[in-house]
Amino acid sequence: MSARAGIVITGTEVLTGRIQDLNGPWLADQLLELGVELAHITICGDRPGDIAAQLKFLADEGVDLIITSGGLGPTADDLTVATVAEFCGRELVLDEALEERIAAILRRLTAGRNLSEENFEAVRTANRKQALIPQGAEILEPVGTAPGVVVPGSPGSPTVVVLPGPPRELQPMWLRAVDTEPVRRAIAGRTVYRQEMIRMFGLAESGLAETLRAAEQAISGFDRLEITTCLRRGELEIVTRYEPAAADAYGQLLDVLRDRHGDAVYSEDGSTVDQQVAALLAGRRIATAESCTAGLLAARLTDQPGASEYMMGGIVAYANTPKAEMLNVDPVLIAEHGAVSEPVAEAMATGAMHHFEADTAVAITGIAGPGGGSTEKPVGTVCFAVRAEGASITRTLLLPGNRSDIRERSTTVAMHLLRRALRGESD
């Protein structure tokens, strides 16, 4: 049996949704890479009783390793270390050397504030609780002021890794925790897995579900594949986890997906459409013209490292006047076809290309709602135009969802149309 782990995310601000949990998903990926099976992720508030209940639940589930996140600060509600110590049956002891290191960090952090020695000592006293460590625990040196700890397990009880809440502190400290003897011992029974991700666009979830049902009947060893599907940004992600001995079954699954949905499969190595477009734009100059997406496409293009090599600029022409004045769209064209139309989208793309002296351009114009729709052009109607050397693509789609959904899906569609054009495909 593979080593098993559980994660406890603490913090009332996370429990109530004021702060999004980023640590659970990141730690889950780390455990997967190590070959450790993740049994549970739980979220609880700052009350010691709630934290203790989660620890007991995971221990009763028989996990080998528990990782906690949050509650290591100097304030009164930061009680994770004390709760873990009690759970593990260990006393809290002041590590004087650690307390000195924390004090040195505090001096650096307060150097520019001209604190008197008396005021600094007050700060130091408030942070002294961070140097209280469960007896026998290994210390993980702090990135901020909060150290982490690794409390070794005993026969029949899990090892507990206690990490801070801020991801920039947690991530490097987890990497140190993995190298400690208690953690290595806890995950000694891990199983090596492979994980592959396929990305698809233009296929409904129901179509994929039907294909997977057929594959289950046709592929020997299909039951050895752990398949998870997720709809994200209008795309389908298929994540498959398997032991190396099941590689042949995964290869057969890939063949089935290619045979049935070759046009929809755009990534077999997990690369995103944004990454692929960035690679295809090497040596090119691109410009954008946006109406309903109001710069979201330009932002998405420039999210990629090295975007300054190919991104010339973008124009948000939300109203008709800037479409005419900045993109040179003929007002007669707008009057005849409407601002949301393929001819106007094409003119916007051409205008952006000329304005920025680019060789590639993408234009989006649509009705994101909630108002502005009509029987002929309901909310969700979006027109796209892509112009690239040797390729031209124009599309009109009716996209589902609310205003935010439509705007985000529009950028995804635009990225895929751009990818096709850069690969030489055209209408």
From Swiss-Prot:
Entry's SMART domains?
A: MoCF_biosynth
Query: Which CDD domains does the record match to this protein?
Result: cinA
* SUPFAM superfamilies linked: CinA-like, Molybdenum cofactor biosynthesis proteins
List the InterPro entries: CinA (IPR050101), CinA-like_C (IPR036653), CinA_C (IPR008136), Competence-induced_CinA (IPR008135), MoaB/Mog-like_dom_sf (IPR036425), MoaB/Mog_dom (IPR001453)
Q: Where are the bilayer-spanning segments? A: none
As for family, the record states: Belongs to the CinA family.
Protein name, entry field = CinA-like protein
- Species: Mycolicibacterium smegmatis (strain ATCC 700084 / mc(2)155)
**Source species taxonomy:** Bacteria, Bacillati, Actinomycetota, Actinomycetes, Mycobacteriales
